[in-house]
Amino acid sequence: MSGRLNLFIFSCFILTFSFSAGAQTLSLKAAVDTALANYGTVKAKGNYANASLATIQQAKRDYLPNFSLSAQQDYGTINGQNGPSYGLGGLGTASSGPALDKQNWNAAFGALYLANVNWDFFTFGRIKQRIKVAEATYQRDNKDYEQEKFQQEIRVSSAYLNLLAAQRLTRSQEKNLQRAITFKNTAVIRASNGLIAGVDSSLAKAEVSSAKIALTKARDVEQEQANRLGILMGVTATDFKVDTASISRIPSNMLNDTTIAQTHPVLLYYKNRVAVSNEQLSYYKRLYFPTFSLFGVMQGRGSGFKASYITDQHAYTSNYADGVNPVRGNYLIGIGMTWNLTTILRNRPQVRSQQYISQGLTNEYEQVNQQLQAQLALAEAKLKNAIDNYLEAPIQVKAASDAYIQKSTLYKNGLTTIVDLTQALFTLNRAETDRDIAYTNVWQALLLKSAALGDYNLFIKEF
C-alpha cells in the first residue's frame, strides 16, 4: 500500500512531536479548521478537482462543429506548367494560370475568402465516452480531495493529542522538580545541623539536577510537538495553549461499530481510480469505429487577371482594389466518412494495457480494504488496552503518592534513608507519567478506530 496510506493508518500513535509558536488558546476543532484552510496539500487537491471539473466542460464542447474563417490577399505571378507535383511537407504554391510557351513576370493582386464548417456528428459514442472519462476523472480527483481532508483531520487530531500529552508531561515534571527542591532544602538544613550525613544533601542536589534535566527534555518534546502541529495547520507558531483537562475523561461513545463504511473516504478514492480506468477502457474500444462528418464551404475569390488573359497577356491589372475584390464565389456541402482501419490493430495492445491497469487498480483497492480491516482490529485491541491502563493509572498514582508522603515524613524524622525517599520520588514521577500517557492513549485509540471506520465525526463530536 502507498506510503500516504501507511501514514494515514499509523499516524494516530506515532508521537511525532513538533516546535512551538505565540501563546494562544487553541481548541481541537479550531486546529482542524485552520489546517483544512491553510495546508498546502489540501488546497492543491482542491485545485486539481476544480481543474477536472473544468475539463468536463471542455469535453462537452468537443462535440461542437469546427467553424473556420479564412482570408488571404496575395501578389504574384500565375505562370502555369503542365506536369505532376505533390505538396510534400505542405510545401508548394497555389498559383493557377495558363501554360504559356514562355516565362513572363506579369503580376497582380489576388484574394481568397473562405468559411468552412466541419462537424463529426456521429462517432459511435466516442464524444460521449470522452465526457464520461472527464466526469469520472473529476469524481476521482474530488474523492482524492475528500480523502486528503480526512487524512489531514486525522493527522492534526493526532498531533493535537500528542501536544496535550506533552504539556501534561511537562506539568508532571514541574511538580517533580518542586518535590525534588523541597526534598533538597530539607536535606541541606538537616545536614547543616548535623542531623544527617552531608552526603544526603549532595544526593538531594543530584536529584534536583536530574529533575531539571527531565523538565528540559519534556519542554523540548512539547516544543517539537507544537511545531509539528503548526506545520500541519499551515501556521508559524512558537507556543500553543491547549486545554489539557479535555482528555482527563474517557469518551462517552466508545464506537461499538465493527464494520468499515463503504463511504470511507480512502476506499471511495481507490474505487474511483478503478472507475476512471474502466471509462478509459471503454473509450479506447470506441476508437475502432469510423467517424461520420458533415461539412460545408463558402468561398469568394478575387484576381487582378482578367478572364481573357489566356489569349491576351496584357489583360491584367496591378491595382490592389481590383485584385482583392471577390468576383467569383462557390459553395459546397457534403457528408463523409473516415475510417482508419489500421487503428483496429494499433489499439488492441492499448486496450489490453488498460485492462491490466484496471485489474491492478482493483487489486490496490482490495489491499487497502484489507489494511483498513486490520487497522480496525488493531484499534479495537488498543482501545481496550488503553481503557484498562486508564482505569489502573489513578490507583498507581494514589499508591505512589501515599508512599512518597510516608517516606518523606519518615525521612524528616530520621526514620528512613535518603535512598528509600529517592526511590519513592522516582516511583511517583513514573506513576504520573504513566497516567498522562494512559489518558492520551485512550483518545488516540478512539481516533485510530474512527479513522479505520472512515467517520471522523465519531471522534470530533467528543470535543
Regions found by a protein language model. Name each.
Residues 1-40, 458-463:
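Bacterial Sec-dependent N-terminal signal peptides
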Residues 7, 151-265, 275, 428:
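Periplasmic alpha-helical coiled-coil/stalk elements that build and connect Gram-negative outer-membrane
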Residues 35-122, 262-343, 374:
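A small-residue-enriched
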Residues 43-47, 60, 107, 121-149, ...:
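Sec/SRP-type N-terminal targeting helices
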Residues 68, 77, 434-463:
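Acidic, low-complexity, intrinsically disordered peripheral segments
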Residues 163, 201, 218, 383, ...:
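Amphipathic alpha-helical coiled-coil/helical-bundle segments that mediate oligomerization/assembly
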Residues 191-195, 411-415, 452:
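A short glycine-centered flexible hinge/capping loop motif at secondary-structure junctions
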Residues 199, 413-437:
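Short terminal targeting/anchoring segments
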